[in-house]
UniProtKB/Swiss-Prot annotation:
One GO-annotated biological process of the protein: cytochrome complex assembly
GO MF term (any one): ABC-type heme transporter activity
Its membrane topology: Peripheral membrane protein
Matches recorded under InterPro entries: AAA+_ATPase, ABC_transporter-like_ATP-bd, ABC_transporter-like_CS, ABC_transptr_haem_export_CcmA, P-loop_NTPase
Lineage: superkingdom: Bacteria
Record's function text: Part of the ABC transporter complex CcmAB involved in the biogenesis of c-type cytochromes; once thought to export heme, this seems not to be the case, but its exact role is uncertain. Responsible for energy coupling to the transport system.
Known EC number: 7.6.2.5
Entry keyword set: ATP-binding, Cell inner membrane, Cell membrane, Cytochrome c-type biogenesis, Membrane, Nucleotide-binding, Translocase, Transport
Reactions it catalyzes: heme b(in) + ATP + H2O = heme b(out) + ADP + phosphate + H(+)
Protein name: Cytochrome c biogenesis ATP-binding export protein CcmA
NCBIfam families for this protein: ccmA, PRK13538.1
Length: 206
């Protein structure tokens, strides 16, 4: 279980959100929603341990993540708004960078799963924005960690890509995983099961 306890975020002397508390448990998907600038990405970065709240705690299995950093990182897959891949490398080389212990066949299978069969040896710089996003998302087919935190994972995907990713997320949740994400696109297949945390603009200052 991932838990936010009275988390406060301040940016440029402006309170984005305060006293924010919620949990995300096994088999659950949580969408962080709200208008641009309310702190959605900032919150995801705090939940991932990439940023520190002004006050409050983020806990994994009841322990503060700053006290179990190495263990927590081994349980987490973070995908940011940008693809986070190296443009000079091929798709397969990027996956090898993240998962050097896995065989090349596994890398190729992951790329095939995201619709990139035949593009394994093409430098990422020569791929479209949607294809680059698919290279990044191929990591979801290679990991067995329970916690996925995804910032706008549907960005640049076509209809087929959205369907592909949706099925993978459904599989992860069905097998006890946790997904926390932001997206501006509808998540119709999860309409009955997704939980929404709505961030609203704050008028406060520290």
């Amino acid at each position: 279980m991932l838990e936010a306890r009275d988390v406060v975020c301040i940016r440029d002397e402006h309170v984005l959100f305060s006293a924010l508390s919620f949990t995300a448990s096994s088999g659950e998907m949580v969408q962080i929603a709200g208008a641009n600038g309310v702190g959605k990405t900032s919150l995801l970065r705090m939940l991932s341990g990439l940023a520190t709240p002004e006050s409050g705690d983020v806990c994994w299995q009841g322990q503060r993540i700053n006290r179990i950093r190495e263990h927590f990182n081994q349980q987490l897959l973070w995908l940011g708004h940008q693809p986070g891949i190296k443009s000079v490398l091929t798709g397969e080389e990027n996956l090898r960078f993240f998962y050097p212990q896995q065989h090349q066949d596994a890398h190729w299978q992951a790329l095939a799963a995201v619709g990139l069969a035949g593009y394994e040896d093409v430098p990422v710089a020569r791929l479209s924005a949607g294809q680059q996003r698919r290279v990044a998302l191929a990591r979801l087919w290679l990991t067995d960690v329970p916690l996925w935190i995804l910032d706008e994972p549907l960005t640049a995907l076509d209809v087929a890509g959205v369907e592909m990713l949706t099925q993978r997320m459904e599989h992860h949740i069905a097998h006890g995983g946790i997904i926390i994400l932001t997206t501006h696109q509808p998540l119709r297949p999860f309409a009955q099961s997704i939980r929404c945390i709505q961030l609203t603009p704050s008028e406060g200052t520290p």
